Amino acid sequence: MSTLTIATRESRLALWQAEYVQDLLTRRGHQVGLLGMTTLGDQILDRALSKVGGKGLFVKELEVALEDGRADLAVHSLKDVPMELPDGFALACVMEREDPRDAFVSNQYANLASLPQGAVVGTSSLRRMALLRALRPDLKIEPLRGNLDTRLRKLDDGMYAAIVLAAAGLKRLGLSQRIRATFEPTDMLPAAGQGALGIEVRSQRQDVIDALAPLAHHTTWLAVSAERAVSRAMGGSCSMPLAAYATLAADILTIDAAWGDPDGKLALVHVRASAAVSDLASATALGARVAADLRAAVLANGGTLLVADAPQGQA
């Protein structure tokens, strides 16, 4: 069996994810090491990601390690992976999804409805900002950057009445007790790929692709391929208030996509489509169709598809 090196960010959550993949590969007879790295996205905490390079800042250094041979694969939270990978790189594996929902986290309040008028809520995405404003336009929404532990510490320091985080990250780190409530997708549609892990490799490394094949989860891969197709066709990034979530039942893939106004001035736009899918190509085609419908609906609603300027500190 082969010897493999995993490139990973050094946050506690990123290391958990890399060690999870390491364990699965080790059980299959591979020798697996870790290469921890601090990315530019981890270092820049005082400016909007949209102003300094977007979510690609979290993967660029890892891709360099793949390119120069220091690492064989990189493990990512799929929602943080840019919709277009550089030439020579491939998404070789999508693993079974954890909880895709967003979590309401607070030390004082049980859920969003219980927050007092004008309460301060911290969130790190324009998507969450837009959806929160659609649910509770009275709230004061403030930027929130940093890794998971940093965000929780800011909440505990009293900077926010509540914060919104991905449920998957909290559950993976054994922090489910911090979740006061979860938002159902009907209330807060997740980001494309949320809750799933993606593994990136150099596209010519067929040996690594073959080693990763047993870790792939076909149903999740179909769903997130459709979601990422929506986002790709919309020009989605961390600087667009876009949500996309797909579910598969009896070979029928249903995609919900939404566009919101972070300022809360325009109504939320939501579209849904379903179709039978059998492979990644048909899932991607359905995602592109949903994106076309969403684009038309946004423009008809008076919205703009230009990427938004996130407030300073916003991711």
Curated annotation (Swiss-Prot):
GO terms for cellular component: cytoplasm. One of its GO terms (molecular function) is hydroxymethylbilane synthase activity. It catalyses: 4 porphobilinogen + H2O = hydroxymethylbilane + 4 NH4(+). Its cofactor is dipyrromethane. It is an enzyme of class 2 (transferase). Keywords: Porphyrin biosynthesis, Transferase. Its EC number is 2.5.1.61. Pathway: Porphyrin-containing compound metabolism; protoporphyrin-IX biosynthesis; coproporphyrinogen-III from 5-aminolevulinate: step 2/4. CDD domains: PBP2_EcHMBS_like (cd13646). GO terms for biological process: protoporphyrinogen IX biosynthetic process. The keyword Transferase applies. Binds 1 dipyrromethane group covalently. The modification S-(dipyrrolylmethanemethyl)cysteine is found at C238. The porphobilinogen subunits are added to the dipyrromethane group. NCBIfam families: hemC (TIGR00212). Belongs to the HMBS family. Monomer. Tetrapolymerization of the monopyrrole PBG into the hydroxymethylbilane pre-uroporphyrinogen in several discrete steps. This is Porphobilinogen deaminase. The gene is hemC.
